[in-house]
């Protein structure tokens, strides 16, 4: 007999029992997709050992969802091979909103999707058992996949001493690390989304492939809800709205580096202005460090040896330089410009730095995935005893910032990875416990990701939920025990001795470009007044009203409003439609009556008409709306 632990209870099982054997004794076990054993995700067919700690996962768990989607990708490949036997499967990973599979020697269109979907449905009905096979010898694996040059290439890259695994279901077998569902039966709702061209390993010099994207769910109801969400997401696509609202553009000559237009810069400046005010009140000092730095800095930071392939490098006077991919090393140099005492800790240093990181062209997407972006970093230098309190301060700052935009969020605490190389066990335990206590005291729900921290410290990730319930990883709070040591940072402690500070590295927006993309989609382009690129548009009824419109525009601009005048020859109704299409918050129509009575005819973005409004009432109300950072109109 062996003893295992599940849900904090100990169970005795016969020696040789699998996770599936144990699961069969649990109610609703047919929903289980896999099992986490000692913090490692595994197949349900895994044999259990004495002392194992188990957690069964379903589709609603991130691990379970990944298993479900990964199996669905294999079912897609199996269906394609049944319909087009000459196709050559390459890889089929899980992605954020589903999965894809790449094929060589295949030509299809979306007209073929119904046939593939029907075949996947048939494979699910056949209820194939999914089994794992391990090759202890690389040559055996090469022989098994000899007819597929893509699999052969992958197998050849495996270390000689590493086991190679594959999974089979019916007549289909694929090279894969797993884990997978026990059978094909649970995949009851399957939908193909689109197809595109791709290159093997993302390299344009390699073989051209056909990529098929799909998504799957345990029930038709969940699939319908997801497809509805995708339709809503299309309406909110920041790339479409960014063009329609004249906020930004993409140019072929500078892929992944967006061009912000004047209207987009108004939103940008409002975001940055809010961020600066928030941080000044929280005791942060702002710096600005160079973008182009000598190789020597990146060698000290470790980027040159570990991150060089993601950096843009060049030579100046025969010396190697790199455009910074991160702000952290520059802040380390700033810290070293003078001596420090524990009395000035926590020392909060902030920087909105322009960073550049290489991304393959196929991964670029609007403002969400770029090569150049601004990151709102801050580095807080402190003593070990201050970690908990300062983390709580940062969490309170997170709460204030995201609530300002009406964004819900959840937090994830990632703990020490198995191969952590920096810091003692004691320091890791103290640091992790401090972050966890701060999370508890913040009264914000959080989950723990065991072993998912960086090698230099535990971290808290901030996941934002938008208006259509999608989640985005934005900010992070990272405890860094690495860089202060690498850069030989020091401070004088209370005993008058030299010590190395602990550093909290945190970003709230994360990438400001990405956060702006999220906001465009969250608000559907209908920004609250304080963020809006155009607060008021004055609409003249006739040419004779233009001087008064310009007079009001000038006066209101001096109060800090973004005001434009439409004195074109279009009809008033057309001018109003144009303003509404550009999501202007307030439209003010000026005709003879308004000028004679010194009043305003105000129309809101939601088409509410407010006639005979006094100028003072209008201005005072929208001033309050703007200055209070209100998310809803006050008129």
From Swiss-Prot:
Superkingdom field: Bacteria
Binding site for Zn(2+): 328, 379, 505
Residue span of region Catalytic: 237-528
Main location as per UniProt: cytoplasm
Compartment annotation: Cytoplasm
Listed Pfam families: HGTP_anticodon, TGS, tRNA-synt_2b, tRNA_SAD
Molecular function via GO: ATP binding; metal ion binding; threonine-tRNA ligase activity; tRNA binding
Keyword Zinc listed: yes
E.C. designation(s): 6.1.1.3
Keywords: Aminoacyl-tRNA synthetase, ATP-binding, Cytoplasm, Ligase, Metal-binding, Nucleotide-binding, Protein biosynthesis, RNA-binding, tRNA-binding, Zinc
TGS domain span: 1-58
Names of required cofactors: Zn(2+)
Entry keyword annotation includes Nucleus: no
Catalysed conversion reaction: tRNA(Thr) + L-threonine + ATP = L-threonyl-tRNA(Thr) + AMP + diphosphate + H(+)
One of the GO BP terms on file: threonyl-tRNA aminoacylation
Subunit architecture: Homodimer.
Similarity field: Belongs to the class-II aminoacyl-tRNA synthetase family.
Function: Catalyzes the attachment of threonine to tRNA(Thr) in a two-step reaction: L-threonine is first activated by ATP to form Thr-AMP and then transferred to the acceptor end of tRNA(Thr). Also edits incorrectly charged L-seryl-tRNA(Thr).
Name under which the protein is recorded: Threonine--tRNA ligase
UniProt source species: Chlamydia felis (strain Fe/C-56) (Chlamydophila felis)
């Amino acid at each position: 007999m062996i003893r295992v632990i599940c849900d904090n209870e100990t169970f005795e099982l016969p020696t040789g029992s699998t996770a599936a054997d144990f699961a069969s004794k649990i109610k609703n076990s047919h929903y289980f997709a896999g099992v986490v054993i000692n913090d490692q995700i595994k197949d349900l067919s895994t044999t259990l050992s004495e002392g194992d700690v188990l957690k069964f996962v379903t589709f609603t768990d991130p691990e379970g969802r990944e298993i479900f989607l990964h199996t669905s990708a294999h079912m897609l490949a199996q269906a394609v091979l049944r319909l087009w036997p000459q196709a050559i499967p390459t890889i089929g990973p899980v992605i954020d909103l589903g999965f894809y599979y790449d094929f060589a020697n295949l030509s299809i269109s979306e007209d073929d999707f119904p046939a593939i979907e029907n075949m996947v449905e048939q494979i699910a009905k056949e209820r194939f058992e999914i089994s794992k096979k391990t090759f202890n010898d690389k040559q055996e694996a090469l022989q098994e996949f000899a007819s597929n040059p893509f699999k052969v290439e992958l197998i050849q890259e495996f270390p000689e001493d590493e086991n190679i695994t594959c999974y089979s279901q019916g007549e289909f077998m694929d090279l894969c690390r797993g884990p997978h569902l026990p059978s094909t039966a649970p995949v009851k709702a399957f939908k193909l989304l689109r197809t595109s061209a791709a290159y093997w390993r993302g390299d344009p010099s390699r073989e051209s492939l056909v990529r098929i994207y799909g998504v799957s769910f345990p029930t038709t109801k969940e699939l319908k809800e997801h497809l509805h969400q995708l339709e809503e997401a299309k309406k909110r696509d920041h790339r479409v709205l960014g063009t329609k609202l004249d906020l930004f553009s993409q140019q072929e000559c500078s892929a992944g580096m967006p061009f912000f237009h004047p209207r987009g810069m108004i939103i940008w400046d409002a975001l940055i202005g809010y961020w600066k005010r928030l941080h000044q009140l929280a005791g942060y000092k702002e710096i600005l460090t160079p973008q182009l730095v000598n190789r020597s800095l990146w060698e000290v930071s470790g980027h040159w040896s570990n991150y060089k392939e993601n950096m843009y490098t060049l030579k100046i006077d025969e010396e190697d330089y790199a455009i910074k991919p991160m702000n952290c090393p520059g802040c380390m140099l700033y810290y070293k410009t003078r001596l420090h005492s524990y009395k000035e800790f926590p020392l909060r240093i902030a920087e909105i730095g322009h960073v550049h990181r290489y991304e393959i062209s196929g991964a670029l997407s609007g403002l969400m995935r770029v090569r150049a972006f601004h990151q709102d970093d801050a580095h807080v230098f402190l003593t070990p005893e201050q970690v908990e309190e300062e983390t709580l301060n940062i969490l309170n700052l997170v709460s204030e910032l995201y609530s300002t935009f009406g964004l819900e969020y959840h937090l994830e605490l990632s703990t020490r990875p198995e191969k952590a190389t920096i810091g003692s066990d004691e320091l890791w335990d103290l640091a992790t416990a401090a972050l966890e206590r701060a999370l508890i005291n913040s009264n914000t729900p959080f989950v723990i990701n065991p072993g998912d921290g960086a090698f230099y410290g535990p971290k808290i990730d901030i996941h934002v939920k938008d208006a259509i319930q999608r989640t985005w990883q934005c900010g992070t709070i990272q405890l860094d025990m690495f860089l202060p040591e690498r850069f030989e940072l020091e401070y004088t402690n209370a005993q008058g001795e030299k010590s190395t500070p602990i550093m909290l590295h945190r970003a709230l927006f994360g990438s400001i470009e990405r956060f702006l993309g999220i906001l465009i989609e969250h608000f559907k382009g209908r920004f609250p007044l304080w963020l809006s690129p155009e607060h008021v548009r004055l609409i003249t009824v006739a040419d004779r009203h233009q001087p008064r419109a310009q007079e009001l525009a000038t006066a209101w601009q001096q109060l800090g409003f973004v005001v434009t005048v439409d004195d074109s020859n279009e009809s008033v109704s057309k001018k109003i439609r144009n303003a509404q299409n550009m999501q202007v918050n307030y439209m003010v129509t000026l005709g003879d009556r308004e000028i004679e009575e010194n009043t305003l005819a105000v129309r809101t973005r939601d088409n509410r008409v407010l006639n005979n409004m006094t100028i003072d009432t209008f201005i005072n109300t929208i001033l309050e709306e703007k200055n209070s950072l209100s998310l809803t109109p006050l008129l």
